[in-house]
Amino acid sequence: MHNAKGLLGRIVRDKLWRFGYRRSLCSLKLTSEDLDYQVLVEGSGCSRTAILNRPPALNALTTHMGYRLQKLYKNWEEDPNIGFVMMKGSGRAFCAGGDIVSLYHLRTRGSPDAIREFFSSLYSFIYLLGTYLKPHVAILNGVTMGGGTGVSIPGTFRVATDRTIFATPETIIGFHPDAGASFNLSHLPGRLGEYLGLTGLKLSGAEMLACGLATHYIRSEEVPVMEEQLKKLLTDDPSVVESCLEKCAEVAHPEKTGVIRRIDLLEKCFSHDTVEEIIDSLEIEASRRKDTWCITTLRRLKESSPLSLKVALRSIREGRLQTLDQCLIREYRMSLQGLIGPMSGNFCEGVRARLIDKDEAPKWDPPSLEKVSEDMVDDYFCALTPTEPDLDLPVKLRESI
């Protein structure tokens, strides 16, 4: 009877995937077993693999996934029989980030506590990963965006492939680069972090390797072979895991026309103190060079939320001087402002225009950079109210281990 029930559950779930519940499973009456199905587990030898498993939604993260990842990773960290941990995604994505359409509906329904819980569960897992005591391998074989970068970059090893697409596209939907992005982006070479955070434009797997976001690169068809080699390891030594990865890894060269080849130009344009100065500098270079890259970059900046651009620039600059936990605590405040606070209309408008109505014509408020005041930006970095608690991270406990 139990086996028949399990088989029926799998059939129902397969039908849900096939018939296109693409945006969110949060609104369905799901059992705890159904929710656990969003993060599967594989075990072999002394390794465990967490599999993000919402393929029709490109493995977008939910609150339950954040909690489940925390529970699994804490148990694995404490288990002396487990030496290292891996993470990968089902289907054609690693992870497209947080389930922003579900967040949009939570915002429009007026569910602030559920929004708080989402960010708390996700950011707490990211901190756990960033302080994890065992080697961690993230296999980024596909779309890796937004929160998907947050649940992978803080780990020990990140394997990119020819199918990897990296981006932090939050400003285009009226939000800010979060999930630890202000820490991760701010530590990239030169002003690459400012470019990625403000424009949300993409990097390839080879570009990720070149700038340090990835530690290794492999062709996607070789990923199963690499996984099998890793699963044979009986170790908790990161150098042994690294040696295995390096035996499977390949040399990758970024495209000659890509952004990695333009580090000097990024320094020239994105080192300015304000978004207005950055745009002015790009416009000068575009007129001088007649370069399609400059034109594409300018167009993307002008399509993004003016407030989000200024917030993102300040966030990345602050992140350069902060630890991961400080960045996550600050980003938590910012995320609540962006979804619950007085300026949350930009997020709703961005998601509506890009993902709901898809008219690609968001009406930003303020509508232009010159109308974004310093007070507006300052408010984005403040707690919602004087009594609003900050994100509670176990900093003393984790850093004393």
Curated annotation (Swiss-Prot):
It is found in: Mitochondrion. SUPFAM superfamilies: ClpP/crotonase. InterPro entries: ClpP/crotonase-like_dom_sf, ECH_dom, HIBYL-CoA-H. Its main location: mitochondrion. One of its GO terms (molecular function) is 3-hydroxyisobutyryl-CoA hydrolase activity. Keywords: Hydrolase, Mitochondrion, Transit peptide. Its EC number is 3.1.2.-. It is an enzyme of class 3 (hydrolase). This is 3-hydroxyisobutyryl-CoA hydrolase-like protein 1, mitochondrial.
